[in-house]
Design a protein with these regions (language model features):
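Predominantly a Rossmann-like dinucleotide-binding segment in NAD(P)-dependent oxidoreductases
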Residues: 2-98
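Contiguous beta-strand/loop segments that form the cofactor/metal-binding neighborhood of enzyme cores
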Residues: 64-140
Length: 140
């Protein structure tokens, strides 16, 4: 569970049922550290080093932490994946291909009690103004 008091409160409210029937969930993690196209590529930009998931592998655990702790397992997943910068400096005076996903939006369905509820997960490395921004919205 994230240490942040707000995250713990959101978890407790959702778990207790006090917010009523849940109608929608949106959870995400955004940052903007990769907006600079002159930033050298690192291991997170190469499928050979981090797998094909890219932003999903890097940021997904933060977006999924509370929903999974609440037992909300995504089904019927529709993904929108984006590669913002297909090439970056390699840090050695050259350029290298970046073949991982920079941004990922997952639209899913979850089971909350007897109801199916839409859940959107957002993992973005390229989000202007974001500085390691984690959030969750549980609408009920």
């Amino acid at each position: 569970m994230p240490f942040f008091p707000g995250a713990q409160r959101a978890f407790e409210l959702a778990k207790s049922g006090s917010i009523g029937r849940i109608l929608e969930v949106v959870s995400g993690f955004h940052h903007s550290s990769d907006l600079d196209p002159t930033k050298a590529a690192n291991w997170k930009r190469l499928n050979s080093m981090c797998g094909e998931g890219g932003a999903l592998n890097d940021l997904g655990m933060h977006a999924c932490h509370i929903p999974l702790r609440l037992g909300w397992k995504p089904s019927r997943v529709f993904a929108q994946l984006q590669k913002g910068y297909p090439q970056r400096p390699d840090g050695k005076g050259g350029v290298t291909n970046c073949d991982t996903w920079d941004n990922a939006l997952l639209n899913t369905w979850i089971k909350v009690g007897e109801h199916e509820v839409p859940m959107r997960l957002e993992m973005k490395r390229l989000m202007p103004g974001a500085t390691n921004t984690w959030y969750i919205e549980i609408l009920g």
